[in-house]
UniProtKB/Swiss-Prot annotation:
Cofactor note (record): Binds 1 FMN per monomer.
Binding site for NAD(+): 12
Residues given in the record as substrate binding sites: 99
Pfam family name, one: FMN_red
UniProt cross-references to NCBIfam families, sorted A to Z: flav_wrbA, PRK03767.1
E.C. number(s) listed in UniProt: 1.6.5.2
Recorded family membership: Belongs to the WrbA family.
Name the UniProt record assigns to this protein: NAD(P)H dehydrogenase (quinone)
Domain of life the protein comes from: Bacteria
Keyword annotations: Flavoprotein, FMN, NAD, NADP, Nucleotide-binding, Oxidoreductase
Keyword Metal-binding in annotation: no
Entry keyword annotation includes Cytoplasm: no
Length: 200
């Protein structure tokens, strides 16, 4: 049985929502075990609450060592100046021991993201994230254009061939759209299908 981990960091809930739909898509594939976890918050709790960070989230916090237990990992992060959030970076910077052992070599790695604006760095966030995964020897999986949501021209929407994305709005008021959530589910299903094939 293939094991898929959806691992995310979410400040205000947008990536958390996307992650839940990624999980939904992955769980639609028979014979795949799907786990949802998050990386630790690095902002002190009082400060985080003061700036509106969603501190209380249902997903348990992951440990670095457990990454080796999965056949595929789908990472989710908000954008910080075209890169992953510092909380995710801090978590991944602790994976040197896994790298030394080659513990993630041959496993699937996939990424989804959120930005505050339409041109806020969605694609650079995902592609720069890929660098870390490639150093670990992971096999990168995105979202193919077989996903019809990628060519939706009837609305402003996230979604890239590199991975699902959502636009949060500069003030965080915009929630993931139906199209963005469809792409997220597609990504989860696509990764799970490939993980199942690799694990068999």
């Amino acid at each position: 049985m293939a094991k898929v981990l959806v691992l995310y960091y979410s400040s205000y809930g947008h990536i958390e929502t996307m992650a839940q739909h990624i999980v939904e898509g992955a769980k639609s594939v028979p014979g795949v075990e799907v786990t949802l976890k998050r990386v630790p918050e690095t902002i002190p709790v009082d400060q985080a609450r003061a700036i509106g960070v969603k501190v209380d989230q249902a997903a348990p916090v992951a440990t670095v060592d457990e990454l080796a237990d999965y056949d595929a990992i789908i990472f989710g992060t908000p954008t910080r100046f075209g890169n992953m959030a510092g909380q995710m970076r801090t978590f991944l910077d602790q994976t040197g021991g896994l790298w030394m052992k080659g513990a993630l070599v041959g496993k699937i790695g996939s990424v989804f993201a959120s930005t505050g604006t339409q041109h806020g760095g969605q694609e650079t966030t995902i592609t720069s994230f890929h660098t870390t995964l490639l150093h670990h020897g992971m096999v990168i999986v995105g979202v193919p254009y077989a996903c019809s949501g990628l060519v939706n021209m009837s609305e402003i929407t996230g979604g890239t061939p590199y991975g699902a994305t959502t636009l949060a709005g500069a003030d965080g008021s915009r929630q993931p759209s139906a199209n963005e959530l469809d792409i997220a589910r597609y990504q989860g299903k696509h990764v799970a299908e490939l993980a199942s094939k690799l694990a068999s």
